[in-house]
Amino acid sequence: MKTFLNIVLFLVLPLVAHAQDITQTLRGTIYDQSTHEPLIGATVVVQNSQPIIGTTTDEAGNFSITNLPLGRVSLEISYIGYESRVIPEVLITSAKEVVLSIALKEAATELEGVEVVAGIRKEKALNAMATVSARTFSVEETQRYAGGLNDPARLASAFAGVSTGNLQDNSIVVRGNAPQGVQWRLEGVEIPSPQHFSGGNVIGGGLVTLFSNQVIGNSDFLTGAFPAEYGNALAAVFDVKMRTGNTSRYEHTAQVGVLGLDFASEGPLSRAKGSSYLFNYRYSTLGLLSDLKINKTGQRIKYQDLSFKLNFPTEKAGTFSLWGIGGIDNTHKDALSVPADWKTDIDRVNNNWETYVGTVGLRHQITAGERSFVESHLAFSGTDDRISTDYLSDDASVFSPDSRLKKQNGTLTLATSLTHKLSPLATLKVGLTSKQLFYKYNLSAAQDYVPSTYARIVNSAGSTNLTEGYAQLKYQLSPALLANVGLRAHYFGLSKELSLESRAGLAWKLSDKHSLSFGYGKHSQPEDLNVYMIEVGGVAVNKDLKLSEAHHFVLGYDWMLTDKLRFKAEAYYQYLWNIPGEEGTSYSLINLRRALYLNKALVNNTKGRNYGIDLTLERFLGDNYYYLITGSIFKSEYKAGDNVWRNTRYNKGFVLNALFGKEFYFANNRKVLDVNARVSVTGGERYSPILESQSVAQKRVIYDESSAFSEQFHTLTYADLTVNYRINHRKSSSVFSFQMKNVLGAPIYIDHNYNYQTGQIELSKATLVIPNISYKIEF
């Protein structure tokens, strides 16, 4: 027995020692929030470390802490005259260094030598001028939150005021607004909706976000009353930041899963100059299944994308970064060749869709003196959609063209902004953006699959311009009262329209635990350019459409119950006007779901109103667990050309989400299991009553538009699950992931269709379960 124990100890003790030897480096840069000036001598301490682990920043604001054990650590950063900041629950793994970029806010006091300690404010946005309806999200949350599927858009559906447009895609409905009102910005530049198969099911949504979460850093999501720097959005803004590649060593990630192959790499281009690269490439495994003839559904889906960022700091000329994203999509479906197999019209249609989308940008950042910071952008975005559909005759002998679409859009953007710290209490930001918009749009289509109606709808090409300017002032009126005021000017060349938009925000800290906030904004948004190009009788009938506009009012209350638990309530009212609609009918773009085949003459005749309350109870990650409970009650109504107030399509009434996650650590933190679950309950979308007898007679769905959106689909209840298991090796990490959306198989309600086999109009529903099993290695 003694011999046996000696053998076991001989084998086990080296493994234990090996585990204890695995450590990692945490590095970063600390700078002034307004001017981006590096803060020299700032103190960085690992909370609750014994003995104390910490360091100070050098002349470039950089710091490095080596030999940190695996697991999670919280950092406290302090600097005289600035508010201290806590960075909570930073994950330390064996494969990759942790590199942080940390901004500190100058304290609202001018007393020399005073150090102000701020609590953990994870719920606040990165943008210091966002007073209400804004929060930050991290790349780790997209991986951890159940239902996120590594996608920022799906992650956001867990936040208060947000619901999924449909489980089939990642579109989101924010406070009753159509998904088309959501804007995406990348590296400070507005970009086209970055989705694979964007707008195929719902405009503003797609299958999955175009860029991998391997390349994004902490980013902001705003849902109302935006600061003045944000324009061209009525619903929400994703302000996404890309990470900067590691400047000291090379690191790589490879992942294979049900949904795709993913490879990322980063590292120094020049260690001496601090330049670096970061890139990521993905290829859809669904495409591989099609190539191998494993996918038997008849729908062949392929997509791939590339993201990159090159960063070049200089000694005196500031920092230059070249970045870009691009994607290629293709989906093809063959019609069923036997008429007896047809259930709906889609079964007798051949469909092919190719999409090319990309953005490339050059950013320059430089400090100007001790109080100013200048950021400039030059970027080009482009999209190219090519769709063809053919309709099989009743006897399955002849295909007739149903639609031919070629849609190309391009945007050349030149932008610059100046942030100037007037004093420790006041910061001014001004900016100017000029965009040249290019378009080429050719569409011919039949109406309701009737070949004899096939005709040209649009054939137009040209360009126009969009010019925007803004000024935003942040002023600390007192230690407890912060004001943000701004003005934005917006000129759209196509309609020759100038819009002046005021913005305001007020945050009042009642005590260390309680605060009130108020926000107001006037906002505007042009339509997709193809809407302006629609022809009726050979005449472009929509070129004089004005900008759609809205007033946003938000009143918020925050209660920090503990340093990790907060309650937040926001009441809001939005009034919309000048939304395009059809004269004399209930039709309006406020309910728009798809826009590729839009062919109506429109006028700015629609008004809308959204109002409700959003509630959040959030327990931030700590002690190895977190939870998030959000609820919203709201109404969304509109009045179009028939002058009747009605429900909008997106007046779901309510949405409720509950998320929970727990981490389990084993083997001296070398192995980590995290389990995450989500349950969501949301009201169904609205739809119009169906004229049954007319629909059956014409073998297509005909809606009663005089009672538009008076009916509602059933309440949707679904659950999501995410399980990750990480193994930290000495120089690499392995991560096994199981993600499943709609794990209980709840049916989703899609639309109504005429069924050839039953001769009836039937509700189209599906049980859509989205699994993603993957293996990732970091090295």
Each language-model region and where it sits:
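C-terminal beta-signal and adjacent terminal beta-strands/loops
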Residues: 627, 680-700, 714-720, 725-779
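Periplasm-facing N-terminal accessory domains of Gram-negative outer-membrane beta-barrel systems
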Residues: 18-113, 119, 480
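Structural signature of Gram-negative outer-membrane beta-barrels, strongest in the C-terminal barrel
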Residues: 409, 423-427, 433, 458-577, ...
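Outer membrane beta-barrel strand-and-loop segments of large Gram-negative receptors
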Residues: 407, 411-415, 457-468, 545-546, ...
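Gram-negative outer-membrane beta-barrel transporters
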Residues: 476-478, 575, 597-685
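Periplasmic N-terminal accessory/gating domains of Gram-negative outer-membrane beta-barrel systems
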Residues: 83, 91-92, 115-226, 237, ...
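Surface-exposed extracellular loop regions of Gram-negative outer-membrane beta-barrel proteins
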Residues: 190, 195, 201, 337-339, ...
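Transmembrane beta-barrel wall of Gram-negative outer-membrane proteins
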Residues: 257-283, 296-332, 352-376, 380, ...
